[in-house]
Amino acid sequence: MNKIERVTQALAGGEVDRIPFSFWYHFGLQHMPGRKHAEAEIDFYRAYDLDFLKVMNDYPYPLPRGIRAIENPEDWKRLEPLEASDFCWGEQLTALSIINKAIGEEALFIETIFSPWTTSRKLARSGALAEAREKYPELLLEAMDNIATSLASYAREAIGRGAAGIFLSLGAAAYDQMSEDEYAIWARPFDLKILEAVRDAPFNVLHIHGERIHFDTLLDYPVSAINWSHFRTPPSLKEGRERSGKTVMGGIDEATAYYLSAPEIRKQVSDSIDECGRRNLILAPGCSVPTDTPARNLLEVKLAAEQT
């Protein structure tokens, strides 16, 4: 099997010659042009011979001119819908085009998008988001919808640049962040607006960040695969696959990737396969591996995956 066939079969629940794998980390290139970002991603992909590439997106969401952080109601009002290529998004789209030209015929790649709620939390000064929820909720909901509209437009353009799907990262679908009822008001409609925009893409992934996550209430999201830190929070990898009916991405503990020995890494991978079986499984970390993870450890993950 080639890489595209292997990943496509895993998503479909078919038989694979071996379990496909990938991992990712933050390159910290948000101040560099898209060409430099693309070069780093391509070099990373080739260094570890990944079965697919999850492209990082460290460029910030474009704020209106003159605003460094959202602080007050007037700032929220200025968050109008954006064009997909506005500001530094254009650099990320340039990176996607370069990546597609370099590897698009040999491997799938997906684009990282942070959910509207996660994005709004990054944009606001400390306390401003909670204040908006309490004092002017309608204004905040309108701003959230504008962010979602902008991200949906960007997601469509990313697919147009060759991405096989998006990796939608949810940063608040956890009980220490919101209740499920709160999430249904403040986040869910805006997550779905983005996913609906790229529903036909073959490789959309839902990443549920954090611990004590809202798992079951997200299972109707239109994605092909789900990713979460199952070494840190329920459900287990097997339970998650059974409850979701979707392909699961896991089996590698990002928190221990830094220091495990080669035998320990191989055991972690083999234990995950023994638990979950070979179908509807992609070997991946539950979140980004630390940027300073030694290359030898990542190579051990690659070797362990290639022996499945």
Per-region residue spans from a language model:
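Active-site loop segments of alpha/beta catalytic cores
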Residues: 1-26, 51, 55, 85-308
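N-terminal capping/small domains of soluble enzymes
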Residues: 8-11, 15-78
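Short, glycine-/small- and polar/acidic-enriched structural segments
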Residues: 74, 81-84, 88
